[in-house]
Design a protein with these regions (language model features):
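Bacterial N-terminal signal peptides that target proteins for export
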Residues: 1-8
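Detector for the c-type heme attachment site
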Residues: 41-46, 101-102
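Gly/Gly-Pro-rich "capping" loops immediately C-terminal to redox-active cysteine motifs
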Residues: 27-30, 45-72, 82-86
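Bacterial N-terminal signal peptides
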Residues: 9-16
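Sec/Tat signal peptide C-region and signal peptidase I cleavage site
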Residues: 18-24
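Residue-level signal for mature regions of secreted extracellular proteins and peptides
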Residues: 15, 30-33
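C-terminal capping alpha-helices of c-type cytochrome domains
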Residues: 67, 76, 85-105
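The canonical Cys-X-X-Cys-His
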Residues: 35-43, 96
Length: 105
């Protein structure tokens, strides 16, 4: 293999690793956001039996976004969720909703 071809192959491999690392970092970031919800809503949004707190696993994405935005704006009354929702950007809320919608109930 010629020297230029080797550099090209190495560059392409490095670019692929970088993209995979970025995807992994994104997944870990969203999982770290979701971990904050586990205190009340259970690991990965699965509540324990007889919990008064709703499970988030499998919740429709658009519904969760709507509810979180309502908490954030104060339109939906809550004991604590309105304060927690204000700590997330709109993009983070959308990421969380996508994450929980993908979880099995």
């Amino acid at each position: 293999m010629k020297k230029n071809q080797r550099w090209l192959v190495l560059a392409l491999l490095y670019a692929g690793v970088g993209a995979a690392s970025a995807q992994t970092a994104d997944v870990l970031y969203v999982r770290s956001l979701a971990a904050n919800c586990a205190n009340c809503h259970g690991t990965n949004g699965r509540t324990v039996n007889d919990s008064a707190v709703p499970g988030l696993a499998g919740m429709p994405r658009d519904y969760m976004v709507t509810q979180m935005m309502a908490f954030k704006s104060g339109a939906r009354p809550a004991t604590i969720m309105h304060q927690l929702a204000k700590g997330y950007s709109d993009a983070q809320i959308e990421q969380l909703a996508t994450f929980f919608a993908a979880q099995k109930k």
